[in-house]
């Protein structure tokens, strides 16, 4: 099993990256918490990897920290939660916020995440509440890239939220309520948009 990859970032998007390791390109699925810490394309990158093996496919999931990887593995250990949904959960909630929701049994917060119904939320709390108390979670570090143009930020957030399962019209309405400042980042605008969508 592949557990760690180190190489050059050949391509990045909010859903996956391509990591060039000695001339071999690995497609690695990532959550937003990892996307926001990525260097510019061409930069050096090391990712903690979870390898998902199925009969017809092998998929790689990458994380900047071991803690994120452990949280991902705890999530997919819950019945009904596969790698895609686990990635979506991490994309919609910072690790510390997710842990807080699980420990405190915040079903409303969990159920607001696309793909999670009340029963799945209850199952997550039941199976992970005690494990979350034992797992130390760090806030994801913000990347050091320069701020992109306002429209580019809106486009990135729109694309990311649509890929998470939100309808374009709903996302556009949420973005219309936001004021994107000169120093805004994709991460900041995404968090603000998610707060509006989860009301």
Swiss-Prot record:
Residues 1-64 are annotated as: Domain I. The gene is ruvA. One of its GO terms (molecular function) is four-way junction DNA binding. Keywords: Cytoplasm, DNA damage, DNA recombination, DNA repair, DNA-binding. This is Holliday junction branch migration complex subunit RuvA. SUPFAM superfamilies: DNA helicase RuvA subunit, C-terminal domain, Nucleic acid-binding proteins, RuvA domain 2-like. Pfam families: HHH_5, RuvA_C, RuvA_N. InterPro entries: DNA_helicase_Holl-junc_RuvA_I, Hlx-hairpin-Hlx_DNA-bd_motif, NA-bd_OB-fold, RuvA, RuvA_2-like, RuvA_C, RuvA_C_sf. Residues 149-199 are annotated as: Domain III. Residues 65-143 are annotated as: Domain II. Disulfide bonds: none annotated.
């Amino acid at each position: 099993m592949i557990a760690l990859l180190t190489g050059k970032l050949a391509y990045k998007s909010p859903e996956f990256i391509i990591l060039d390791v000695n001339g071999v390109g690995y497609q690695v699925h990532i959550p937003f918490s990892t996307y926001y810490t990525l260097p510019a394309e061409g930069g050096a990158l090391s990712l903690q990897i979870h390898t998902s093996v199925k009969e017809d496919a092998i998929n790689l999931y990458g994380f900047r920290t071991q803690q994120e990887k452990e949280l991902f593995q705890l999530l997919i250990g819950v019945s009904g939660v596969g790698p895609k949904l686990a990635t979506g959960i991490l994309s919609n909630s910072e690790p510390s916020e997710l842990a807080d929701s699980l420990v405190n049994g915040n079903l409303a917060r969990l159920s607001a995440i696309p793909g999670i119904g009340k029963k799945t939320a209850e199952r997550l709390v039941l199976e992970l509440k005690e494990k979350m108390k034992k797992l130390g979670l760090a806030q994801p570090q913000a990347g050091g890239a320069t701020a992109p143009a306002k429209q580019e930020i809106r486009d990135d957030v729109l694309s990311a939220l649509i890929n998470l399962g939100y309808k374009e019209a709903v996302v556009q309405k949420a973005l219309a309520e936001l004021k994107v400042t000169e120093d805004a980042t994709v991460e900041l605008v995404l968090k603000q948009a998610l707060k509006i969508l989860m009301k």
